Amino acid sequence: MKSYLSNDTEAKLKKTKDLPPHIHFIGIGGIGMSALAMILAQKGYSISGSDQKKNLTLKKLEENKVHIFPTQVESNIDEILKVHGKNILVVKSSAIHQDNFELCKAKKYNLKIKHRSEILAFLIEQKKSIIVSGSHGKTTTSTYITTLFSYANKSPTAIIGGIVPLYKSNYSCGNSEFLIAEADESDGSLVKFNPNIGLITNLELEHVDHYLDLEDLIETMKQFAQKCECLITNFDCDNLRDNIHGSKWFSIQKIINIDFALIPKESNGCEIIAEYYEKEKFIDVIKIPVPGIHNLSNAAAAIAACRVAGILFKDIKKGIEKLKLPSRRFEFKGLWRNRLIVEDYAHHPSEIDAAISIASTIIETKHKLSKILPRRIVTIFQPHRYSRTKKFQKEFAKSLSKSDLVFITPIYSAGEDKIEGINNKSIGHELKKINPNLEIYTPDNNQNLIKLIKEQTIENDLILIMGAGDINLISENLFLELINNKLISNDIAA
């Protein structure tokens, strides 16, 4: 198969204006911002950043000679100007409010200010790019593409919204001409990109804080589609099939008139056996070593992107057996008191459905994990954003009703103001309407949640912790307790 990547890299480089020698990131600890900062630091730019939350990412940045300010105050900008002068660039994300002290000071001094998407666009223009967008599966799909490229000896630059197991990082500064990145649709900024290959995994209304309705989202995705040299889209998604026609289709349901099909044959909750077809021609039987039908779709998308980029299937197959999910995507954390702890980033009803579906398959197929045979699905869900919770409250309840025991924590606001009557208890109320017999708990804080987990769960439970906020702290606290009590199990799921 010929590559659909054009040979215009040199022309792109000639058109691309360079960035100022020093770049300051407001909120540098975020998953997207930190990846950009690390790439630019390795390219030789002087980098600084501020973040009020301590995490391992900041430590990594400091190890790479990035200066970190632990607060976001006006004096940070003054300090930077003393050292670097006014020829600096300030980078912000959509999460940074207009009244941020550093941002206000940068505006006062008339400094150059750019959105993070403009920095990503700058990097895209310098490479042959594969840009992944869509409502769900962006991080997993871009992780898969990066992994397959790497095992095909293509050494890509990668900017990913999660930790890629191969690199144990959210970025890679490769030495080839390829760049793989996610295009975040949450704020509409993806229309700034001009990808060689664009890929849309699926389309569903999620970010109700930015989009009025599904039609509004579709119009934005159409703009992105028009800017792609070659567009790969998911035939199995009604919203894509009916509204956005790509250059190439992939599917896990259909072979006829499909460019890349990956049809499932067997599944046991940890891997899927599938038949691979190109333009209706059978190519091979392959084993995808990750669970979940949605992850098979992500794998099909990744294979399609690699083939369109010109990578031989025999080279792709070498990497398929090495595929692993990124962090917090049905991630097995280990055993806690003979309960299996799993974390997932699910924060939309469809994502919760997908995560619970994997858990159900594990139980139905009696697949033994970490020396236990899971028998019940216990879900711990942290709603993310008041606006999303209000919009999808009934849908959240319907998805969670497929569990055997449910804990719903207070809403992670992500900077949003509270909405009267919208909280964890209102979801619990909707859940009771669907299943009056379901055991539901709505604790007011993490301390009470941990107490309830100890009291209400039993051995052989599969405890599925879901959410896009800081709910991962729960598993950390549970395992920390084991360490403190010298009861830690070293039997971590592979």
From Swiss-Prot:
Enzyme class: ligase
A GO term from the CC aspect: cytoplasm
InterPro entries xrefs: Mur-like_cat_sf (IPR036565), Mur_ligase_C (IPR004101), Mur_ligase_C_dom_sf (IPR036615), Mur_ligase_cen (IPR013221), Mur_ligase_N (IPR000713), MurCDEF_pg_biosynth (IPR050061), UDP-N-AcMur_Ala_ligase_MurC (IPR005758)
Protein role: Cell wall formation.
One GO term of the biological process aspect: cell wall organization
Protein name, per record: UDP-N-acetylmuramate--L-alanine ligase
Keywords for this protein: ATP-binding, Cell cycle, Cell division, Cell shape, Cell wall biogenesis/degradation, Cytoplasm, Ligase, Nucleotide-binding, Peptidoglycan synthesis
Catalytic activity field: UDP-N-acetyl-alpha-D-muramate + L-alanine + ATP = UDP-N-acetyl-alpha-D-muramoyl-L-alanine + ADP + phosphate + H(+)
Species the sequence originates in: Prochlorococcus marinus (strain NATL2A)
The organism's place on the tree of life at top rank: Bacteria
Locations listed in the record: Cytoplasm
SUPFAM superfamilies per the UniProt record, alphabetical: MurCD N-terminal domain, MurD-like peptide ligases, catalytic domain, MurD-like peptide ligases, peptide-binding domain
Protein family: Belongs to the MurCDEF family.
GO molecular function: ATP binding; UDP-N-acetylmuramate-L-alanine ligase activity
Pathway assigned to this chain's UniProt record: Cell wall biogenesis; peptidoglycan biosynthesis
Amino acids binding ATP: 134-140
EC numbers for this chain: 6.3.2.8
